[in-house]
């Protein structure tokens, strides 16, 4: 734990320093005077209001001295505030201790905190209370806190030890393991701990245990899927790979034999329906997931992620056939096959028959719809996880599917209506994936604490950038909230918070009832108000609990009107008040000076004096803020005045229309800009402070209207940018920072779009140079030779036509992906344009209001407005160019590439009817599209100065760029030969080399028969008699078998 610096302050130290200062000014043998008593009560009231937190070390350093000083205050003054704080010291301090634990530090830090609690509730503290005749059984006192907290720590340590004991490897050895999400964390929020539930260390313990155990339930469900014999072997294999990738990834991760053995057994059951043989698979490209799956299957181990160089491996089938197979994948868990589903929902690389694709999509849609139905019927975390995981929607695939669909969405956004972008299978898979991502993002912090509550609020709110995507899926935000709210809702135990508040109120009332003096009763009301203001603000910020009505109502003396203060007649005489006493109050109000405390007199401690305090002290505080320039030193000074105004009269006087709450809110809004210079203000911050200043202004206005006419101070106009330095300077700072921020975002967007556009030009140039080549049919069927268009004697290489077309499609798809990225960036740019437009309007509005502050302020916002307008023009110009770039259905310069690929798809469907004739037709088609593309490229690239003729180096670079991943075919290459095996049969006529049938056998003229003499003499030969005997044996055996049957 870090050391405490000498200039560091925290609430307990501030209280200690104030009480020490008071003690140093008074004699220990003499009773304290009214002024010292008032200052002590004010100090305790300020501590009740303090919103700061403390570390364990800070409390260790100061709690004894502070506790002793509070007891000294009580001994000298018998004030109820000191009694309340001393008797409930333990709870009120622990409520302010902030802790942060992790897997390695929780034991040491929790033991340290436990020792601190033991000291604060030990014999020494109890004896101090007893000597002063104070209770030790107060609700937050030592006799109540120590048993409760020590029991909680015992439960916490047991829960944390259990949570961190569980490991994936440990759970594999459990025969039957049943675990409900949140069980361990729920024990830390039992009803018996409701009094300390809101304490920060309790919430930190709940957070730690929730995160430490949140992975267990998903792991158990997924592991169960890897061993479920109802699933097919391939389904179990894919679940096992997902399990290993999520829970056993890393250099030192264990490799349990149970998983290895079952995986190897399942791999042995795979056949040609699930795998493509290595010889055929090596000529095709694989995604990273397919490489990972192929490596695991080849080595029969899910812990192998890559294929060793030079090794051939079978490839997992990912076409529509694997989806349609009744024996390969379990029908309810088709989503676990990541690569196959991605191909169907992305429409990438689909070259099968349209009917087969439609059938596969329909089957996948039905499978995903059953998952969606199961989600709809779920009502608990376990049921929801089972509905997702058992149907193949594990964490990895949900992320991949949502990402793929977002890419697809941006590629098609704007070209068709939002409702028509996705087909049925994309919508249902997307809906389940979106829900899955939300669930997996929440489940690992699921628990009854504030951490899960904040995560829940963040994850269930769909960002504006995703709103169009969610709507295109047909998924409503209300449905997401309904499902999550039904299955894994937050459990914040608001009743515990309200019960703790009720206990605090009851304790304050009990202390007040024991007070004999009227002044003490009034002061405990003020202390109660301060403590409740702190508690209610905290409950609202952390838990979102709106304070009870009674905490916000006016708490004035019955002599003061408490209805509509806007209609108060200031000339109405107050009951029991004479002119002399009123004059004395006016005189006292005129002597109020910052930072002096309130003078203690009969007139100043009456509730009637409160309106004078508001009209002077609060008006000074308001003026100090509105006249300050937005800077750390000036705001620091204003903050001190605000704090002084909030605490003024606290021991004796209640709030006036909740003025202390409004001052406290203003303090909270300003503090961030006085503590950390890196906190940049926004226009929303400025508007918030303007609103808070307005609320305080209304309170001051009411108080002034209640004063006698001759005593009313001048009330300035309501604070706004036209009359407030802090608002105009804060708006100016915020708008300047926002201009820089939006300009930086625009620059990043421009830079990214520029790079993407350059890539498109490179791709277009590569296609242009590539199609200037001469394409000639190779000697081997299904191949094509590439030549320089003007140098036919120099071949650039021979490739399979299938490889050439695949390479062209990949490059074209890469260009399409770039267009999709550009469309996505264009959506971000439009968001930036909207934000810039809003800031421009705000800038103009403030410029009009700034007229009253002089021409310098007007000029500042005029220049800012011109800068915003210039940025807007730049953004709109860029947006116009992007719209032109993305308005086509194909990347620029590639329309005929799209036409060629479309024709190739048609030819692929009927390719079985073609032999060499198909090769010639494809060569002709390629030559034709090359000529068309050349004309098109000459036109499209003229603006960037591209030469009309491609030089040899450019052509070679283009061919290398397109075909770099595909092997060159030589004349004697055997790669076209397909080996028949149990895992492969000929499915395509292009796989057969028919040229062999056309080659005639011609005997050489110079056959040397003597070269065969050695073999003829030395090797054993089969004689004719031996052959006859074998044939007779076979036939005779057949006859006898027939005779026996007869």
Swiss-Prot record:
Main location group: virion
Location of this chain's protein in the cell: Virion tegument; Host cytoplasm; Host nucleus; Host Golgi apparatus, Host trans-Golgi network
GO cellular-component term (any): viral tegument
Annotated spans, Interaction with large tegument protein: 543-1046
Annotated GO biological process: virion assembly
Keywords from the UniProt entry: Host cytoplasm, Host Golgi apparatus, Host nucleus, Virion, Virion tegument
The family this protein is said to belong to: Belongs to the herpesviridae inner tegument protein family.
Function field: Plays an essential role in cytoplasmic secondary envelopment during viral egress. Interacts with the capsid via the large tegument protein/LTP and participates in its transport to the host trans-Golgi network (TGN) where secondary envelopment occurs. Modulates tegumentation and capsid accumulation at the viral assembly complex.
Assembly with partners or alone: Interacts (via C-terminus) with the large tegument protein/LTP (via N-terminus).
Name of this protein: Inner tegument protein
Native source organism of the sequence: Gallid herpesvirus 2 (strain Chicken/Md5/ATCC VR-987)
Gene designation: MDV050
């Amino acid at each position: 734990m870090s050391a405490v610096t000498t200039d560091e302050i925290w609430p307990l130290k501030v209280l200690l320093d104030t009480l020490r200062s008071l003690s140093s000014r008074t004699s220990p043998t003499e009773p304290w005077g009214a002024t010292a008593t008032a200052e002590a009560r004010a100090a305790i009231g300020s501590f009740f209001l303090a919103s700061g937190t403390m570390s364990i070390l800070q409390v260790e350093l100061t709690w004894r001295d502070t506790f002793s000083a509070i007891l000294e205050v009580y001994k000298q003054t018998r004030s109820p505030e000191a009694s309340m704080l001393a008797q409930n010291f333990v709870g009120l301090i622990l409520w302010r201790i902030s802790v942060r634990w992790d897997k390695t530090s929780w034991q040491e830090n929790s033991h340290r905190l436990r020792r601190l609690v033991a000291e604060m509730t030990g014999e020494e503290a109890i004896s101090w209370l007893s000597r002063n005749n104070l209770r030790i059984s107060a609700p937050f006192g030592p006799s109540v806190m120590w048993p409760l907290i020590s029991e909680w720590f015992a439960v916490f340590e047991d829960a944390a030890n259990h949570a961190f004991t569980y490991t994936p490897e440990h759970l594999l050895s459990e025969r039957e393991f049943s675990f409900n999400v949140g069980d361990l964390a729920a024990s830390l929020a039992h009803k018996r701990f409701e009094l300390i539930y809101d304490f920060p260390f309790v919430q930190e313990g709940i957070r730690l245990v929730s995160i430490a155990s949140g992975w267990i339930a998903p792991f158990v469900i997924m592991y169960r899927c890897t061993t479920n014999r109802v699933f097919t072997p391939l389904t179990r294999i894919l679940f096992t790979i997902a399990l290993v990738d999520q829970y056993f990834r890393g250099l030192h991760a264990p490799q349990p034999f149970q998983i290895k053995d079952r995986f190897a057994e399942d791999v042995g059951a795979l056949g040609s329906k699930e795998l493509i043989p290595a010889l055929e698979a090596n000529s095709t490209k694989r995604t990273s997931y397919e490489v990972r799956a192929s490596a695991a299957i080849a080595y029969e181990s899910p812990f192998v992620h890559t294929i060793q160089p030079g090794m051939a491996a079978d490839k997992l089938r990912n076409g529509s056939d694997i989806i349609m197979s009744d024996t390969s994948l379990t029908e309810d868990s088709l989503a676990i096959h990541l690569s196959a589903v991605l191909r169907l929902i992305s429409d990438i690389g689909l070259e099968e028959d349209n009917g087969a694709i439609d059938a596969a999509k329909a089957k996948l849609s039905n499978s995903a719809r059953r998952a969606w139905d199961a989600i709809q019927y779920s009502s608990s975390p376990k049921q929801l996880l089972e509905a997702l995981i058992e149907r193949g929607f594990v964490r990895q695939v949900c992320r991949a599917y949502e990402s793929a669909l977002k890419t697809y969405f941006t590629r098609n956004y704007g070209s068709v209506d939002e409702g028509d972008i996705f087909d049925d299978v994309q919508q249902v898979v997307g809906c389940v994936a979106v829900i899955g991502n939300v669930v997996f993002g929440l489940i690992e912090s699921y628990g009854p604490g504030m951490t899960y509550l904040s995560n829940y609020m963040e994850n269930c709110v769909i960002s504006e950038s995703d709103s169009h995507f969610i709507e295109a899926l047909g998924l409503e935000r209300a449905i997401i909230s309904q499902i999550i709210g039904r299955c894994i809702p937050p459990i914040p135990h608001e009743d515990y918070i309200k019960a703790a508040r009720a206990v605090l109120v009851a304790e304050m009332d009990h202390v007040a009832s024991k007070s004999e003096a009227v002044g003490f009763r009034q002061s405990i009301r003020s202390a109660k108000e301060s403590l409740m203001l702190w508690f209610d603000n905290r409950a609202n910020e952390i838990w979102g609990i709106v304070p009870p009505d009674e905490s916000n109502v006016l708490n004035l003396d019955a002599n003061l009107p408490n209805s509509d203060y806007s209609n108060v007649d200031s000339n109405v005489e107050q009951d029991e008040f004479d002119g002399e006493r009123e004059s004395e109050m006016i005189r006292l109000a005129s002597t109020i000076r910052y930072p002096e405390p309130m003078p203690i007199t009969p007139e100043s401690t009456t509730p009637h004096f409160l309106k004078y305090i508001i009209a002077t002290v609060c008006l000074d505080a308001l003026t100090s803020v509105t006249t300050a320039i937005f800077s750390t030193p000036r705001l620091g000074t204003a903050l001190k005045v605000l704090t002084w105004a909030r605490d003024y009269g606290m021991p004796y006087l209640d709030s006036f229309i909740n003025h202390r709450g409004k001052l406290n809110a203003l303090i909270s809004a300003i503090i961030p800009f006085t503590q950390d210079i890196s906190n940049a203000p926004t226009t929303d911050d400025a508007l918030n402070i303007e609103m808070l200043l307005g609320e305080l202004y209304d309170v001051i206005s009411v108080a002034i209207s209640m004063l006698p006419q001759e005593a009313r101070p001048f009330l300035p106009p309501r604070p706004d940018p036209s009359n407030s330095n802090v608002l105009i300077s804060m708006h100016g700072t915020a708008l300047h920072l926002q201009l820089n921020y939006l300009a930086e975002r625009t620059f990043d967007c421009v830079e990214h779009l520029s790079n993407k556009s350059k890539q498109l030009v490179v791709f277009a140039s590569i296609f242009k140079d590539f199609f200037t080549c001469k394409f000639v049919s190779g000697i081997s069927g299904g191949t094509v030779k590439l030549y320089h268009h003007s140098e036919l004697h120099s071949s650039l290489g021979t490739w399979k036509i299938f490889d050439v077309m695949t390479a062209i499609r990949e490059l074209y798809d890469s260009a399409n992906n770039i267009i999709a990225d550009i469309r996505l960036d264009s959506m971000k740019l439009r968001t930036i344009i909207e934000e810039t437009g809003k800031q421009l309007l705000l800038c103009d509005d403030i410029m009009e209001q700034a007229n009253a502050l002089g021409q310098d302020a007007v000029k500042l916002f005029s220049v800012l407005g011109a800068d915003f307008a210039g940025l807007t023009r730049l953004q709109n110009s860029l947006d116009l160019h992007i719209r032109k770039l993305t308005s086509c259905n194909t990347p620029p310069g590639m329309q005929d590439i799209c036409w060629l690929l479309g024709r190739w798809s048609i030819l692929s469907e009927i390719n079985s009817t073609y032999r060499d004739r198909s090769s010639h037709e494809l060569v002709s088609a390629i030559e034709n599209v090359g000529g068309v593309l050349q004309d098109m490229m000459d036109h499209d690239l003229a603006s960037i100065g591209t030469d009309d003729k491609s030089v040899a180096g450019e052509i070679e670079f283009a061919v290398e760029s397109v075909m770099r991943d595909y092997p060159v075919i030589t004349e004697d290459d055997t790669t076209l030969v397909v080996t028949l095996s149990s895992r492969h049969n000929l499915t395509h006529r292009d796989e057969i080399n028919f040229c062999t049938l056309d080659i005639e056998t011609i005997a050489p003229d110079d056959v040397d028969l003597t070269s065969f003499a050695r073999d003829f003499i030395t090797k054993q030969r089969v004689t004719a008699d031996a052959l006859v005997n074998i044939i007779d044996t076979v036939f005779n055996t057949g006859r006898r078998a027939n005779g026996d049957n007869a």
